[in-house]
Amino acid sequence: MKIQLIAVGTKMPDWVTTGFNEYQRRFPKDMPLELLEIPAGKRGKNADIARILEKEGEQALAAVGKSSRIVTLDLPGKNWTTPQLAQQLESWKQDGRDVALLIGGPEGLSPACKAAAEQSWCLSALTMPHPLVRIVVAESLYRAWSLTTNHPYHRE
């Protein structure tokens, strides 16, 4: 099973790339974590935010692998503990499909992305900068994987 992290925004600061890459390299070969960046639409004083969201959503959905399970990261989503995320990871593996996790831009995800999702995950009720979300998701998934394989990274 491959996990795609599809995120709106490019040209992240070095600390984001370093942090994400640290967890990405730890994933096993049979469950690689891949980052796909979608360019954010130009936001300005007179920007049509609905149109920007729509375009970002179209690009994000086009990047999703065929037959992949789509999971959005969104506030109304489920708030999983680490053991619950580990159970989700196992369930996704049993399903046999790849997983595409969608992270929106400053205004979130398009209605089309939300409608296409089979699940929605609320990472936190806190507002986080989108660059940080990439690292937190990568670490959370790695921690969940370590729990499912009895790897010593996660401790109760």
Curated annotation (Swiss-Prot):
EC number(s) reported in the record: 2.1.1.177
One annotated Gene Ontology cellular component of this protein: cytoplasm
Main location group: cytoplasm
Top enzyme category: transferase
Protein location: Cytoplasm
Catalytic activity: pseudouridine(1915) in 23S rRNA + S-adenosyl-L-methionine = N(3)-methylpseudouridine(1915) in 23S rRNA + S-adenosyl-L-homocysteine + H(+)
Primary role: Specifically methylates the pseudouridine at position 1915 (m3Psi1915) in 23S rRNA.
Family, similarity comment: Belongs to the RNA methyltransferase RlmH family.
Subunit structure: Homodimer.
The protein's name in its UniProt record: Ribosomal RNA large subunit methyltransferase H
Organism: Tolumonas auensis (strain DSM 9187 / NBRC 110442 / TA 4)
